[in-house]
């Protein structure tokens, strides 16, 4: 498009062209008032993208303020590229999670790949070296050909980018439910390590300092990607493939090394990734955070397509690009540094004192807008909220224990449910050992990565049972945080903090906004009780297809500190003769459970309950026992209940089984999904010390029979299952469905 064809300010207003860009009538009137005139086409584009939900959080900010964001270890909370938490010895962990849902629904390979690329840039823009990747994925049922295609391509995209860039993908989760059929969720998390003195901010300080563009050249890909992420998917979304960016992991690898070298230079003032909204967000946010302005000369932007307009250059979301501010007079050092890596670094502007973002192109000023208006002054909406109609109905339901005829068959069927089944098909495509720091590989409760040069490790996990959150957003929100912490503890780590990715439907629908409010209330309470502040995250709204929303899915990414790698604990049984303990009581709680979904084809009723004080007490006891060397294996009891947890601990071991006795009604004892429960094994000689330290019930012992046998309290056998057969069923389920 040439400049001749761009509508003039009067046309933009009279023909409501701003509405096509995503601005409401009221918002356009606000822009007019801020500028004291009608905006031109480029300026309208700047406001439309910066005031989108994806960039401004205008619908979610009032809710996000409820999160606890401070703590004695928190060095950087929400507001920068990623959050930072102190781990002692002058070191810190940097991490964040983001969504790439809409792009992945349209172009799954590139959508997932660029989601990984973007989150890596957020972490190294803080000055940290990325050391691990995780992902949390949601798809429809694998029986659908479209879902199979999305699943295979998303996993290939994550693998393709992560493996090429040389950062191990060490963990995550994949869940399958019909509500994600047309709108998969792809949440990527990156974890990095940094020394305190190397922490950098995305701020443009110092009038007269130079603004430079580094990395890949700018094309027309991803224009309006942020606006696209702020609307519902529809049949016409397929036509928006151009809004999906294309990634180059080899370019990003060079960019990481160049930027980490740059961070050691005192010439650098500020650095930010050109993520959602590209040059617009990076320039406006860096200026606004520093209380400064920026002037940019767009003719100097490296362009890979001809005839690009200022509008296109400012809104492009081409990948592998960073905006940096350097001390005036030091530009050549930066050019030389990036040239060494074969990357472009060009001067394209300067920092000013007047807080304005000014853009020049072909000798003319093409935009003049207050930086704060773009970055900080988006309207904030307090959306109407209304309790979902189904909620009262579910709360009043009298829940009956599901009828199960054959316990062994039911266990095998549960092990083959895609949400429970082995995800080896997924993680075998990821290089999870690159950099040789991975201590606990995918498949256990949490991954653990060594902190080089120390005896410490970082435990990390992603968790969210969206079925519970759909049934009861507040309780489900508590459970999401508690389960993440439980997984960290089972791996020998002390939970530190969380990043979140709030995936919801259309916030303009009061029942959806109610889900958002309630789940954030639950998560906030859990974060306060478990002392895991929220240090950053991402909101992804409008996850709907043809008016049907996905389950509310506020994914929790948590990192914990393993104080000594000797404490690392995994879920599989270690040796015959060890004692098996269960911590926590089992109630007949089946709402949202894997058994309920399998038997009824839907979920209903009340979610499992949780008492956060009890949760904290149990986690502290388990962690102390692990740190005292009393624990052989630890596994959190989650989907599928105790029978599945015990089976998973046997499947992961070589030739070991277990004989256990469970009290209470058999179906609940085996398959209920009550919270705050652990399966722990302990050496016989540590029995007394363990029982003194932890409130736990001994239920049996590990055997070398290669069978799991579960009795009831009358000592009648409820089921006996061969571990090899279980392993085969559990490992074969997903590959079988993909055939």
Swiss-Prot record:
Active site (UniProt): 54, 100
SUPFAM superfamilies: PurM C-terminal domain-like, PurM N-terminal domain-like
Keyword annotations from UniProtKB, A to Z: ATP-binding, Cytoplasm, Ligase, Magnesium, Metal-binding, Nucleotide-binding, Purine biosynthesis
EC number: 6.3.5.3
Pathway: Purine metabolism; IMP biosynthesis via de novo pathway; 5-amino-1-(5-phospho-D-ribosyl)imidazole from N(2)-formyl-N(1)-(5-phospho-D-ribosyl)glycinamide: step 1/2
Key word Glycoprotein present: no
Subcellular localization: Cytoplasm
MF terms (GO), sorted A to Z: ATP binding; magnesium ion binding; phosphoribosylformylglycinamidine synthase activity
Protein residues bound to substrate: 99-102, 121, 245, 317-319, 540
Family matches, as InterPro entries: PRibForGlyAmidine_synth_PurL, PurL_linker, PurM-like_C_dom, PurM-like_C_sf, PurM-like_N, PurM-like_N_sf
Protein's GO biological process: 'de novo' IMP biosynthetic process
Family in the record: Belongs to the FGAMS family.
NCBIfam families associated with the record: FGAM_synth_II, PRK01213.1
Subunit structure of this chain's protein: Monomer. Part of the FGAM synthase complex composed of 1 PurL, 1 PurQ and 2 PurS subunits.
Role played: Part of the phosphoribosylformylglycinamidine synthase complex involved in the purines biosynthetic pathway. Catalyzes the ATP-dependent conversion of formylglycinamide ribonucleotide (FGAR) and glutamine to yield formylglycinamidine ribonucleotide (FGAM) and glutamate. The FGAM synthase complex is composed of three subunits. PurQ produces an ammonia molecule by converting glutamine to glutamate. PurL transfers the ammonia molecule to FGAR to form FGAM in an ATP-dependent manner.
Protein name in UniProt: Phosphoribosylformylglycinamidine synthase subunit PurL
Organism encoding this protein: Bacillus anthracis
């Amino acid at each position: 498009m040439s400049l001749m064809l761009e509508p003039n300010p009067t046309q933009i207003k009279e023909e409501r062209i701003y509405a096509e860009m995503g601005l409401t009538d009221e918002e356009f009137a606000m822009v007019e008032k801020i500028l004291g005139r009608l905006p031109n086409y480029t300026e309208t584009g700047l406001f439309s993208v910066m005031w989108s939900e994806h960039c401004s959080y205008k619908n979610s900010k009032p809710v996000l303020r409820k999160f606890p964001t401070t703590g004695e270890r928190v060095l950087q909370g929400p507001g920068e590229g990623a959050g930072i938490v102190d781990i002692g010895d002058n070191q810190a962990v940097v991490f964040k999670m983001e969504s790439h849902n809409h792009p992945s629904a349209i172009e799954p390979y590139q959508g997932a790949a660029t989601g990984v690329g973007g989150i890596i840039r957020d972490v190294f823009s803080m000055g940290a070296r990325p050391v691990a990747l995780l992902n949390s994925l949601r798809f429809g049922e694998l029986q659908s050909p479209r879902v199979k295609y999305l699943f295979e391509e998303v996993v290939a995209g994550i693998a393709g980018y992560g493996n090429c860039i040389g950062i191990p993908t060490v963990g995550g989760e994949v869940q399958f439910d019909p509500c994600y059929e047309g709108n998969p969720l792809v949440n990527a998390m990156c974890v990095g390590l940094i020394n305190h003195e190397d922490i950098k901010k995305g701020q443009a300080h110092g009038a007269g300092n130079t603004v430079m563009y580094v990395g890949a050249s700018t094309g027309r890909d991803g224009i309006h990607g942020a606006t696209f992420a702020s609307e519902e998917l529809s049949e016409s979304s397929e036509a928006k493939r151009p809004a999906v960016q294309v990634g180059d992991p080899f370019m990003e690898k060079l960019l990481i090394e160049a930027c980490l070298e740059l961070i050691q230079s005192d010439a650098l003032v500020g650095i930010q990734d050109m993520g959602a909204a590209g040059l617009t967000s990076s320039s406006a946010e860096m200026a606004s955070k520093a209380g400064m302005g920026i002037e940019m000369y767009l003719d100097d932007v490296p362009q890979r397509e001809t005839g690009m307009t200022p509008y296109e250059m400012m809104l492009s979301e081409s990948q592998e690009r960073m905006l940096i501010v350097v001390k005036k007079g030091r530009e050549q050092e930066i050019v030389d540094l990036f040239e060494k890596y074969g990357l472009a670094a060009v001067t394209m502007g300067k920092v000013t004192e007047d807080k304005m973002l000014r853009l020049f192109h072909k000798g003319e000023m093409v935009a003049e807008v207050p930086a704060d208006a773009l970055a900080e002054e988006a309207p904030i909406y307090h959306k109407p909220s209304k309790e979902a109609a189904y909620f009262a109905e579910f709360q009043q339901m009298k829940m009956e224990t599901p009828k199960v005829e054959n316990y062994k068959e039911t266990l095998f069927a549960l092990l083959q449910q895609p949400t429970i089944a082995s995800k080896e098909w997924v993680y075998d495509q990821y290089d999870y050992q690159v950099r040789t720091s991975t201590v606990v590989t995918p498949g256990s409760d949490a991954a653990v990565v060594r902190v080089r040069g120390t005896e410490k490790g970082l435990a990390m996990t992603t968790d969210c049972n969206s079925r519970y959150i759909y049934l009861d957003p507040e309780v489900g929100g508590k459970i999401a945080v508690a389960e993440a912490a439980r997984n960290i503890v089972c791996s020998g780590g002390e939970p530190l903090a969380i990043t979140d990715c709030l995936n919801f439907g259309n916030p303009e629908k009061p029942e959806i906004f109610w889900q958002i409010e309630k789940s954030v209330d639950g998560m906030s309470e859990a974060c306060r009780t478990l002392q895991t502040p929220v240090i950053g995250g991402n909101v992804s709204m409008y996850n709907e297809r043809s008016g049907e929303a996905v389950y509310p899915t506020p994914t929790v990414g948590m990192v914990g500190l393993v104080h000594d790698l000797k404490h690392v604990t995994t879920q599989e049984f270690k040796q015959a003769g060890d004692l098996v303990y269960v911590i926590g009581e089992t109630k007949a709680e089946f709402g949202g459970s894997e058994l309920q979904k399998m038997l009824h084809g839907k979920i209903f009723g009340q979610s499992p309950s949780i008492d956060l004080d009890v949760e904290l007490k149990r986690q502290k006891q388990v962690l102390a026992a692990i740190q005292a060397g009393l624990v052989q294996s630890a596994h959190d009891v989650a989907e599928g209940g105790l029978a599945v947890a015990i089976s998973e601990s046997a499947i992961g071991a070589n030739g070991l089984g277990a004989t256990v006795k469970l009290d209470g009604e058999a179906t609940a004892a085996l398959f209920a999904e009550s919270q705050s429960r652990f399966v722990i094994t302990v050496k016989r000689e540590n029995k007394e010390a363990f029982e003194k330290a932890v409130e736990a019930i001994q239920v049996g012992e590990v055997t070398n029979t290669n069978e799991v046998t579960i009795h009831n309290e009358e000592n009648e056998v409820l089921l006996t299952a061969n571990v090899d057969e279980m392993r085969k069923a559990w490992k074969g389920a997903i590959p079988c469905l993909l055939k």
